[in-house]
């Protein structure tokens, strides 16, 4: 097994050679490891392009097809020829930019089941934020050209979520992204900003002072190495990383063509929770947010809604539940436990409620019928939530 120094240098090299979600690179690194894969790629780059496949394991070529590798090596060749390993090694040793790899304790556990996740992340700031309790990390995104209403909602919601101990993730752009980060900075809570280029080229430049503040109290992060230019396709790839890093994505003010919807779609594809703040039905800049809710996203109107969306069932004690005195009155202990574990807004199935309450699924199904007749729960497509709360 290669030593850690070689491994880190190879991971950094591959971040320079490839763009996000390079399927061939991910396959090669998964099969051979970053160090061996880099050696093969460098040898192949110096040979005739038609002979590149001869450097790969025969079984790998047979399973994946030779044409795939011809195209991949063609993509990598220019960057392989320009790769300066001594200069890269020197940059890593200076320590201005941290490199987080899959071997590091700070590598995000949230990436465990994410297909084609990066092999390395570049960071400035507190990298321990990457591997904290996953349910505390929430992406909050929205329009760049934010309205007065969106401005007020983003500021208030981000402030309150930060106060509840959540770490908010966003993209550092104008509008909602910037408001979310600024609310966290004012609340003196850490925030993570995912950039679409190298950390030495933060974009937009007008937010440079904010990025400096984030690097001191939170984390600046990118899957692209220093020197990388922010480009349109990298912004789209960055959105996937924002969703992957977070337990949930909350969209605040998005039109039908907003990049925030791209982040939300990535979240859905990754099996993450997605919520949206509703807006006026006659304003097109809110049409995307409203459509998300229509398509099944959780309606978000408060920090409590966000907390309930991301927390395991039965772990959130809602203020609305506490003030509704006597909602468990007249129930036997098992029924009370099952009702207490039933969520307020997002319906849950019998299996989830059974896990949260410690009851058997059969007990949940039996008792839910009685609770529904009493008007204490509502059934929606085979799932339940509390009624009248």
Q: Where are the predicted features?
A:
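Short, small/acidic-rich helices and loops at N termini and domain boundaries
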Residues: 1-105, 374-383, 387-389
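Glycine-biased, small-residue-rich flexible motifs in mid-sequence functional cores and linkers
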Residues: 1-8, 16-19, 93-95, 99-389
């Amino acid at each position: 097994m290669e030593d850690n120094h070689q491994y880190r240098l190879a991971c950094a090299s591959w971040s320079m050679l490839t763009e996000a979600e390079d399927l061939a690179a991910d396959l090669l690194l998964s099969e051979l490891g970053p160090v061996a894969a880099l050696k093969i790629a460098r040898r192949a780059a110096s040979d005739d392009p038609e002979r590149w496949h001869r450097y790969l394991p025969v079984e790998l070529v047979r399973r994946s097809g030779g044409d795939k590798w011809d195209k991949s090596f063609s993509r990598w060749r220019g960057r392989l020829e320009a790769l300066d390993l001594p200069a890269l090694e020197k940059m890593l040793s200076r320590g201005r930019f941290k490199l987080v790899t899959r071997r590091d304790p700070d590598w995000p556990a949230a990436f465990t089941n994410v297909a084609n996740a990066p092999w390395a992340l570049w960071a400035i700031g507190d990298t321990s934020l990457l591997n904290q309790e996953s349910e505390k990390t929430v992406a909050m995104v929205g329009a760049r050209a934010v309205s007065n209403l969106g401005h007020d909602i983003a500021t208030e919601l981000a402030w309150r979520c930060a106060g509840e101990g959540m770490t908010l993730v966003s993209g550092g752009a104008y509008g909602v992204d910037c408001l979310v980060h600024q609310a966290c900075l004012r609340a003196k809570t850490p925030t993570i900003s995912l950039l679409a280029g190298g950390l030495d080229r933060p974009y937009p430049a007008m937010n440079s002072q904010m990025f400096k503040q984030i690097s001191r109290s939170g984390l600046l992060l990118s899957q692209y190495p220093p020197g990388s230019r922010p480009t349109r396709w990298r912004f789209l790839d960055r959105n996937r990383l924002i969703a992957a890093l977070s337990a949930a994505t909350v969209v605040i003010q998005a039109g039908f063509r907003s990049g925030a919807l791209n982040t939300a779609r990535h979240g859905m594809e990754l099996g993450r929770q997605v919520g949206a703040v509703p807006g006026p039905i006659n304003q097109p800049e809110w049409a995307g947010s409203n459509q998300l809710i229509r398509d099944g996203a959780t309606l978000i109107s408060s920090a409590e809604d966000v907390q309930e969306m991301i927390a395991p069932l039965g772990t959130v004690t809602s203020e609305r539940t506490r003030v509704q005195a006597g909602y468990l009155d007249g129930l036997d202990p098992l029924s009370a436990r099952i009702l207490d574990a039933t969520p307020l807004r997002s319906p849950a199935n019998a299996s989830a409620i059974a896990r949260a309450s410690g009851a058997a699924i059969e007990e949940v199904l039996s008792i839910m019928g009685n609770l529904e007749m009493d008007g204490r729960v509502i059934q929606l497509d085979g799932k339940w939530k509390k009624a009248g709360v």
